[in-house]
Amino acid sequence: MATIMDFLLRQGLNVPVGYSSVGSQSTSSSSTSIPMDSSLRNVDYLPEIDITETKDSLIIECELAGVLKEDISIEVAESKLIIKGDKKRYAYRRPNQSWSYDDKNQISQSSKISEQSSGADQWQHSNDPNVDSQSNLNMPSSKQDPNVQQSRVGNVPESKVNRNDTTEPNLPSQPFQSDMNPSSSSSSIEKQQIPNVSHPSFQQWSGQPQPQQQQQQQQQQQQQQQQQQQQQQQPFEQQSQQQSNLNDPMQRQDSKEISQPSELQRSNFGESSVNQPSSSSSSLLGSDNSQSNVDLPSSRSVEPQRPNVSDSDTNQGYSQSVEQRLGNTQQQSSQLPQQQQQQQDQPRSNVNEPSFQQWSSQQDQHRSNVNDPSSQQWSSQPSEQQQKSNISESNVSQPSSTQFVENIPSNLEQLPQQEQQRSNGNEPSSQPWSSQPSEQQRSNINEPPSQQWSSKQDQQRSNVNDPSSQQWSSRPSEQQQQQQKPNIGELNVNQASSDVCSGPSVSETRKQFEENYLNEQQRQPQQQDLSSLHKDEKKPSSSSVSQTAQLFEPNKREEQRKDKPEEKKFDSDIIKSSEPTNVESIENKDWIQQKPQEQQQEPREISSTETSNLQQPMERQINTETPKEQQVSPQQQQPQQQQQPQQQQQPQQQQPQPQQQQQERKYISERTFGHFKRTMDLSKMLYRLNLREEVQTHFVNGLLIIILNKKPFEPSIKIPVN
């Protein structure tokens, strides 16, 4: 005990102490042990320690101004109580005092280091050979804009490009170099030209690994001649991929061509995707945003972008099948410059033309399988690769989609194209116009009429890029049904989200769930025990089903109590929160009458925290029950019957304590020293326990209670400490 007192003293906690002393001897503050027959008189420096010495026990209470951490070793040797604590770990503090110990200092210093380092590079590139060049790249932008520094975990190159373009839009030929430190510009370019394919932080930037991107770009170029719609998508995707991957060797050759439309880059990255890894979907959304509705960046940047992060962008590279990617391995890098120059102006010039709308109608397809040829050709039969990828897509994307039910922006009228690009993906925000689909989508995909579309909406949402589902067949394809069988988690997710979108509202489904749950709860106890029904024959027959269900809970409780003594506290809360009817008083009567007998039959081992937790809520429950029940009780018979069990409660509740506490003697609860914040308002009850040679320690409501008894066990007396 003295060691705790010593380092409390060194903390400067000079709170005066009240204590009752019986005895003459006192020990100096530097001693490491306390003779048991002495009471401490020189404890003025301690924070509120009560030391109570009775005939057979010494009770020490410390009220600690802080948090008591885990490991305090307590030994009893030859009538001496020795408490040892490591001062560095216990960081006690006054309310206005900052943490001042070693581990805390290390934490604060490390956080300062991470703030001073360039943005998120410390975390992103811990294993990266290019750390130096990349941190040099990012230093200026992190100094310019602290917001970018915080939000840019996966985005380092994008925000870098974006900052330069927005601040210097008139320098089209310098999108990348102007942000570099001049000393490191040449070396960093050389390093960046070597694609660091396998590095994980690189994959975090781009949302998908590099070799797949190159091959997917080649696949796109092969399809370029087939469909004019794709011609508009490709330059955006390639630009965003190349800007997000500074390591692409193509990108250095074409930097001038990429940098010409500074509006495109600004719209791609400035508004929409500062906060997320770049993906072709975000760049498509962003460019659409700047060109068709320039005045709506706020709704764009706040709401729609979150699902894209958890959409299959992160999944996509991994879920695409190997045979798709390995089919087209020949390099077509010679086409890149012309292709980009050809098509950079098309999306801007075609904003309001049908081809642009065709592009937007396929946006959901892009979101999950951005560069997948089979999904863009709308083949009538789903490839195996898509069946594979869709399973993972729906798992990833569904949970995030439910967050957006209430966030549908108010300016929907102004956002028809953008919102539908988003909503045709995995979000339930597509519901408002599910009954009347936009002309763009119907005309371009050659769907049947709109009723089939809205009725198949959950099908569309769970399999965004399944070609068979996008042909809107009137019955779900077999591939979908197969897809939902193997993966149970996905099936649950899809069902829940389809309820949100096309079925009843969230509150209705929740009501339905609660009703089902209550019905099950009511069925189970009746099967368990019908015998206790006879106890309720005195009661009026008008009691509801839920009340009769509560009748049987004592039987459940007793089963639980045999295994988990901690459940008592929870049960008392259940009693309070459930309808306060006369049923509860019967419940308590049965429960209390059976309680001492059980304890005699089965000695249990309860840790000291559990006893201190058990006894307080039960006594508090006695007080809170009577007013509630008398207010609610419809008949006058009930209060009279209620008072009888409560009179029985109080004597019977104190009797089982000796039995519980006798079993506690062998166990010092190690869990008592946890992180408990001090709460002054709760009642402090001390139970004198006999532990013979061992010490019982409590940490209850901010009190450290250390009790050591000298004599064999006697029936316990409650010692209230004020």
Swiss-Prot record:
Residues 106-118, 203-244, 272-292, 330-347, 374-389, 428-443, 468-484, 634-662 have a biased composition (Low complexity). InterPro entries: A-crystallin/Hsp20_dom, HSP20-like_chaperone, HspG1-11-like. Keywords: Stress response. It comes from the Eukaryota. Residues 40-179 form the sHSP domain. PROSITE patterns: SHSP. The keyword ATP-binding does not apply. Residues 119-153, 167-182, 189-202, 258-271, 293-329, 348-363, 390-427, 444-467, 492-507, 541-550, 608-633 have a biased composition (Polar residues). Residues 99-666 are annotated as: Disordered. The keyword Transit peptide does not apply. Residues 554-576 have a biased composition (Basic and acidic residues). PANTHER family: HEAT SHOCK PROTEIN DDB_G0288861-RELATED. Belongs to the small heat shock protein (HSP20) family. This is Heat shock protein DDB_G0288861.
